[in-house]
């Protein structure tokens, strides 16, 4: 009888194949100003891979509704759904950074995370219904220093100025040496102003905040904190990566206006609306798998490199249970490489 560990080992590279194919099928839309077409190409490739994989995958975090684009939606089924196949909760963003692809800019990746759901267990990931959330991500070095040196905890309720002080103390840095990444949106102006006023180094990104939020947990990324209001699905995908890396993301729902707040309160309590979720609360259990493939260069991964008749992809694969992190460089011969697309129900050349 297969154990959860065996099931994860058997299936994890299928998830990498899905993000690789999404990157290869969407790279042709780089810089062409049509983010919906790039997103559709990535979704088609991901669906095509899972049409051949014996799992019962249910999408608990999708990307299509928020982006108003063709997508893979909440409740969609991935896999063959054969009776005895393993069940997975799946969160994905076929392209995190669609605007970047459309503009030919860096910082776009294809991302999938999954959590094995044993029989009798309800779910492996939490579905947060808000479009946007307040998010704060930091690496294991900060978490460990707070625990061992009894520093003040980092929370979303603290003024961000205090968070900078704690982070600097935990990392044995001056505040002026901290590097903070913020999504460049008007709703994040408060954080932008604080970082500048306190003298820390600010890195603004135009789109694609999963890679940015994972970066503080990666050695040599040069990023210390990620903060700001961004997409909730991206936050949960980030949590599955940080589960393997030992980092932390704090997340709280952020209604854009009163009508959205009232709509959210139809499905969640006031306490849940105000709750700050931790990594372990967003991704329960130890079975999370996270994988991503670079489309254009990002702090997390290099993008697809097209040279002559070859395409080189760079992917990352993480498992929370073993805390193993694999970097995968694959060279694809475009003369022989084929991918399965759901739209045409067959294999085709890239």
Model-based region annotation:
Residues 1-22:
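N-terminal hydrophobic or amphipathic helices/low-complexity stretches enriched
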Residues 17, 26-38, 42-48, 52-55, ...:
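Alpha/propeptide regions of enzymes that mature by internal proteolysis
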Residues 66-68, 187, 206-213:
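Short acidic loop-to-helix transition motifs that present clustered carboxylates
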Residues 84-95, 99-135, 139, 171, ...:
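Active-site-adjacent structural elements in enzyme catalytic cores
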